[in-house]
Amino acid sequence: MYWEEDNQDNISKTNDSIVDVSFKVNCKKIAADHSYDLFEAVLKKFPQIKEIENLAIHSVYGAESGAGWERPETEIYLSKRTRFCIRTPKEHSKDFFSLKNEILKVGEYEMQLSKPTIKDLIVTDTLFCRSVVVENSNNEEEFLKNVHSSLKSMGVNVKKMLCGKEHLIKIPKKTLVGKT
């Protein structure tokens, strides 16, 4: 854990040039390691994403446990409230409306997208990341030092960090190590 006290209030402002395009999804379950398959599915329906800078395709999130139940490691069960999000420059946001009602083939699963909504980014003092790719198997302290250094170089002042679970991300010809 990385911890630094700060009693100063910093006023932050959001950059309104980036937005989230958010879709409700109709899909009962999806592979736990679906990130690359999801990217490929979006690329197939919307090849222009290769040309868009500052674009992020977020993986789909499902609960890990609840009411005594724990999620299997291979699949994520999705609720009716599950959303799929593409973070994009505002000038490209309306382009993604072409994905309305499309069915994405994500690995062996099919995921139907609803009509999207555009959501502005909000200012927050908490940054949560489901997956940070790690170049080598750093111990937690080394990993947090590297993350702190990277964020500082981008002008992000970090006061507290907590490392989560390590997981594998499979892409063609390679397996990456990620940490939350």
Language-model features: locations:
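RNA-interacting cores
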Residues: 1-180
